[in-house]
Amino acid sequence: MNMKKQDIIEIFFEKLFPVAVFSFIIVSLVIQEDISLAKQVMSFPGIDADLACNKQVQEALSLLESEPLHDPRAPRWVGKLAASLKPGRFAHSLSVAWMSRRLAHVHGLDPLKAEQAGLLHDCAKCLPLDEMQRIAVDHSLTDDPELLASGALLHSVVGSWVAREDYGMTDPDVLEAISYHNTGYPGMTRLDMCVCLSDSIEPLREAYPRLEQIRALAETSLERALLLSLEGTADFVTSRGKFLHPRTQNTIAWLKRSLSEAR
């Protein structure tokens, strides 16, 4: 085979160079005696050189060192998430899975379901809004005009569909937790609360007002912690002249009423 020099160069940079860089990263981690992190990086085929270099991704993987993801499908899911999400969003998803599972253990919930919902909760977050809208309309997921107008809101509903169709998730409890993780709803289950709350307090979250107070409350009461979290969301949204979805407003009112009646 007569290959030109340019062909060889292109093959090197397209095929061999990424492998070499990835191998270098693994070797570097081993040299730094971060054996656990090296194993974590190698255990997920979808984590390429760029992701392995990302500090947030490394931090998220470090959370999973002592207790890896339990679902046997997790490596495949992680590979799909790595390919479809931005690095920060990917790291956030791993961190929410860790946090959801932890809170589930604390509050006597199903840790596997919590992990699954936490891992997949943002699986549609990086889709373009017009694609989210197309999926929502084509599959009759919602006719709420306020949801349809905002990717920040719509990705949860579409994410539940994507989790079922693309990731093979069939558990209705998990799919429901994904559907409502960003708005909540009156009467939501404790698993729903666990995932919704974990989304806002996972370890990689940048500091915001009352974050540490919410984290502390989450150790003893999902309801009180979620109420404080949603009230903070309401303050943040309204202070910027933006729209707070009625479902969130109703969830806040429901939590206040429930906590008052429980006294």
Residue map of PLM features:
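Long, amphipathic alpha-helical surface segments
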Residues: A225-V237
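Divalent metal-dependent catalytic cores for phosphoryl transfer on phosphate-bearing substrates
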Residues: G79-S84, H92, R101, H105-L228
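Charged phosphate-binding loop/patch that engages nucleotide di/tri-phosphates or the phosphate backbone
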Residues: S239-R263
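N-terminal secretory targeting signals
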Residues: D34, A38-Q58
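Short, positively charged and aromatic/hydrophobic N-terminal segments
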Residues: I25-S28
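Short alpha-helical hairpin
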Residues: S62-W77, P128-Q133
